[in-house]
Amino acid sequence: MIIQPRVRGFVCVTSHPVGCAAHVQEWIDYVKSKGVIAHGPKKVLVIGASTGYGLASRVTAAFGSGAATIGVFYERPSEEGRLATPGWYNSIGFTRAARAAGLYARNFNGDAFSDDIKKQVLDAIKADLGQVDLVIYSLASPRRTHPRTGTVHKSVLKPVGAPYTNKTVDTDTGIVSEITIEPATETEIADTIAVMGGEDWELWMHALRDANLLAPNAQTVAYSYIGPEVTWPVYKNGTIGLAKNDLERAAQALDALLKPTGGRAFIAVNKALVTQASSAIPVVPLYISILYKIMKARGTHERCIEQMQRLFATHMYNGQTPRFDETGRVRIDDLEMAPEVQAAVREIWPTVTTANLVERTDIAGYRSEFLRLFGFGMPGVDYQADVDPHIPMI
């Protein structure tokens, strides 16, 4: 079939298998162009491995350090009349490239929150790798069925305490408008922490340790975001921010767990980027469109893959210890949060309207990057060609 992008709201409901593979290959080529990451990880588990920062971490580990990787994700295969999700095609593209390079790559498609998937993954590590020396935790999920209680928790992206009104942009139509988001209830706050907080990360790490599957000096990292004050009510001080606070609590507990064997656990605070997760957050896409324009002009713009390659090469495997901030986090949002960048954002933000959106922001770059997440707009891909969307997981 011939596959074209079809965007509904903040999601593209089609994805292109050849384009997704080309996008992954572009990331692989970037990592290889930066050279070998000396003393990098060799056996890596990536929980949330099919898109965004998780996929970029897997690519960096494999093609920067020659690591064997196990990827866990929850993606939908194609069925009659329906394409697979981009993460499905991404993971196949990655796995083909890794195996062609002689690297071990194994995939588990299922609910990472469940005991069943944890057991399957632990059995695979025991059988194939013996132990892992790096665990990446990069899940972004709208819901979690708690493995102990069976309760289904659903996360929400809302402010806490009071309604929040600010500008937002419909990235499809380019209309800039005001949006008011009502505050979360106590139940919604608790549910969001249950989904996006640190409990599941702890369950994974304790299961790995109890089964003796963590190598000496093993590291684990989870990803977070802080951002500028304009996004704080809906992010840092909102429901998702409270969940990220719980993730930081878990990082400290896991760091204490790993310290006796020379390991460490920490949070990396990443840059605002166009991802399937960030596109769903009100206000944030407009901020990203402004940020991209400023950072591209300064020559400091990074995508997921540049961020993760820099995290691995200059912090985690730099021959020394990572550089931590005052609360023990690694800050690879440093270029985004540079005072002069944020001053420029604050200057542009109040002036943006529907009429001047294209001139004042990089909405074109946002849209292009958004479509690339789904395999569209990749150079060298013939989008008029007939392609088979039904590809089994490998």
UniProtKB/Swiss-Prot annotation:
Alphabetical list of InterPro entries matching this protein: Eno_Rdtase_FAD-bd_dom, Enoyl-CoA_Rdtase_cat_dom, FabV-like_NADH_b, Trans-2-enoyl-CoA_reductase
Binding positions (NAD(+)): 48-53, 74-75, 111-112, 139-140, 244, 273-275
Active site (record annotation): 235 (proton donor)
Site note Plays an important role in discriminating NADH against NADPH, residues: 75
Residue positions binding substrate: 225
Keyword Metal-binding: no
Gene3D superfamilies: NAD(P)-binding Rossmann-like Domain (3.40.50.720)
Pathway(s) served: Lipid metabolism; fatty acid biosynthesis
Catalytic activity: a 2,3-saturated acyl-[ACP] + NAD(+) = a (2E)-enoyl-[ACP] + NADH + H(+)
Residue ranges the record marks as coiled coil: none
Keyword Lipid biosynthesis attributed: yes
Free-text function comment from the UniProt entry: Involved in the final reduction of the elongation cycle of fatty acid synthesis (FAS II). Catalyzes the reduction of a carbon-carbon double bond in an enoyl moiety that is covalently linked to an acyl carrier protein (ACP).
Quaternary context: Monomer.
Stated family: Belongs to the TER reductase family.
Protein's UniProt name: Enoyl-[acyl-carrier-protein] reductase [NADH]
Organism: Opitutus terrae (strain DSM 11246 / JCM 15787 / PB90-1)
Gene: fabV
